[in-house]
């Protein structure tokens, strides 16, 4: 489609702004990620002497890095409106977030809306597709202890065993609290047809806005962090270094992300900011772990039911622009999530000052050695 004379200045501004944002993102990554790695390296003696304190400091830096990613969307006008139950109330408890997956922007949205939930981001473990391991943020996630999972039948059983070992060695020993999981196993646009064919074959509901979840990873997480806890031996790593024993996994947070007109934001849009300001809506429901069945067949049915309910939530949202009110209430209440501009300024300043500091330290040692 040809660009008119009237549209040319506007299009030029969009392109110029996208280029400036991209340049800033590159600079941000070049100072923040190497600085994070350098701090982690220099703090290794503390990891041996006081593991809990080491992972606390690492978690803070991890939260700041995710805050920087969140700020890219924030200053492009991509904000979040929260609905449903207040998850701040359980920020210090162990929980699993089950999230529907539409696009790469889902991860950025969660990075933003969880920033004001106390220690959650610092003590969080992500389960994400292995392709993210090869992004600029992959090394940070590897150090933090996030898990990269390969999709596909050929890898499924082997990956679940690796996940089980990963939880046993890294979850509680690093004082992790929340796990973020996308049970659909892929983006909506890629899995919808396969899911609908599976539903038709097995007499399950026909879903449009979500796909039927895969239960494998959820099953492994619950067995590792709930079942063994009941037998008196804390799962997820050696907890002897912790000041008090963990009470185990306590909550499932059913999280539903909805975009206006069902048009999701991808990571390119989040970085370049060429889309008009958009409000993403996130709905939370909290389920006590005692209400979640642990037997495979019952757990599968329970998960299916949650995603059938997600379908209803999203259908209502796309028709009305709002999520339905909870049972017994006439109107749903939403909360605008905000980021502090001062906090963003401080973490960005720390990142660039750290980058400057480490550059000169490395340069000094390089000249001393060579």
Curated annotation (Swiss-Prot):
Gene Ontology MF terms in the entry: 2-acylglycerol O-acyltransferase activity; 2-acylglycerophosphocholine O-acyltransferase activity; lysophosphatidylethanolamine acyltransferase activity; lysophospholipid acyltransferase activity
Name of this chain's protein: Acyl-CoA:lysophosphatidylglycerol acyltransferase 1
Enzyme Commission numbers on file: 2.3.1.62, 2.3.1.22, 2.3.1.-
Entry keywords, A to Z: Acyltransferase, Endoplasmic reticulum, Lipid biosynthesis, Lipid metabolism, Membrane, Phospholipid biosynthesis, Phospholipid metabolism, Transferase, Transmembrane, Transmembrane helix
Organism: Mus musculus
Reported consequences of knocking out the gene: Mice are born at the expected Mendelian frequency. They show reduced body fat and increased mortality during early adulthood with an average life span of about 5 months. Mutant mice produce poorly nutritional milk and are unable to nourish their litters leading in high pre-weaning mortality.
Any Gene Ontology biological process: triglyceride biosynthetic process
Alphabetical list of InterPro entries matching this protein: Acyltransf_C (IPR032098), Plipid/glycerol_acylTrfase (IPR002123)
